[in-house]
Amino acid sequence: MTTRPTDNETDVASVTFDAESENPQARREHTSYSARRSIVTLLQLEKYSALWVWAGLILIFALWVPGTFLTLSNVQIILSSQAVTAIVALGLIAPLAVGAIDLAAASAVGFTGMFGAVLMAHSGWGAVPTIAATLVLGCCIGALMGVLVSVVRISAIIVTLAASSVLSGMVTWLSASQDVVGLPSQFLSIGSGTALGLAWPFWVMLILCLCAWVFFDHTATGRYMHATGLGPEAARVSGVPTTRLVVLALTLSAAAASVAGLLGTARIGAGDPSFGPSYLLPAYAAVFLGSTQVRPGFFNAWGTVISVYVLATGVQGLQLAGAPVWIPDVFNGLALLAAVGIAVVRQRIAAHRALARVRRLVMSRASR
């Protein structure tokens, strides 16, 4: 499908052409700029720069620690072990899309994992009813937070921070600060089973990624969520049900956290009271870094998953090279700062370019 240039675009193009024809220096600068743009377009750097970074990291660590990094077992470990982080990150896309911050996601991972473990180990529930009950509970927690944010009008940061504290306390109460063991083999097989050499959680994550991609990029509700985040008042005036969308967003985030909690517990093999909180930072780092990929400027599923594995590759490579145990936290924190910084710089560059085009257009019309 071809599009016809607008009058403004035609005017800007003519002004640029006139300026270049009169000024050889401008013409050379334009040629250099065009060459750089051609390289960027060829390599798809604006959309897929993380893939090139990922390839670079793989090459660096393959040369640095060749005996351990570039092996089949290490690739399987990276892909399988990061599935839970990726699921948490996919869930965070929803609240961020509507302009909310969910600080309870990681605590919800720990709580739902412990809740499911207690039901099976202490109450004798089977795997299937436990999974169903845990998912329902997770959705109810998310919906309650959504109501407090969108209906009662309490700040999302306050609501989710309070919820995080409550859920962490509930984990301690349910577990008595002890591991909950004795989970049924049917449930444990979800975490230990493999297909094509990769753990089941990886395939669950991949399915959820596909669902998130369809929902956020190809449905009206997903587009309305992005519209709500970009301008809630404008979206509300336009008829977008922003209140319901905020409730839905936090419900989806909690549902994803519940899935992650169950899968993580199945993979560990027991209910671990310390499980969950450590996922918050890498998940947010991946979501913000993902917003600079695939669909720059929008929180999106594929960019998020790619970013999860870029960060995981860096951390795993450093650990195999003998880096200290505190490296993952530092690495993910710096990655979060870098991701937000890149997003801000891109917005400013886009605004600067738009302003420059407007100025050239105004000057051309004033000179006529």
List where the protein language model places each region.
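Hydrophobic alpha-helical transmembrane segments
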Residues: 48-52, 78, 86, 107-111, ...
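Transmembrane alpha-helical segments in multi-pass inner-membrane proteins
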Residues: 257, 267-332
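Short loop segments and helix-boundary regions at transmembrane helix junctions
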Residues: 40-42, 96-101, 120-122, 126, ...
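Helix-loop-helix "hairpin" substructures at the membrane interface of multi-pass membrane proteins
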Residues: 125-130, 134, 140-145, 149, ...
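Transmembrane helix-bundle core of multi-pass membrane transporters
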Residues: 152, 156-218, 245-248, 267-276, ...
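Single transmembrane alpha-helix segments in multi-pass membrane proteins
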Residues: 55-123, 147-154, 287-301, 334
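Hydrophobic core segments of alpha-helical transmembrane domains in multi-pass membrane transport
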Residues: 50-63, 91-92, 164-168, 204-213, ...
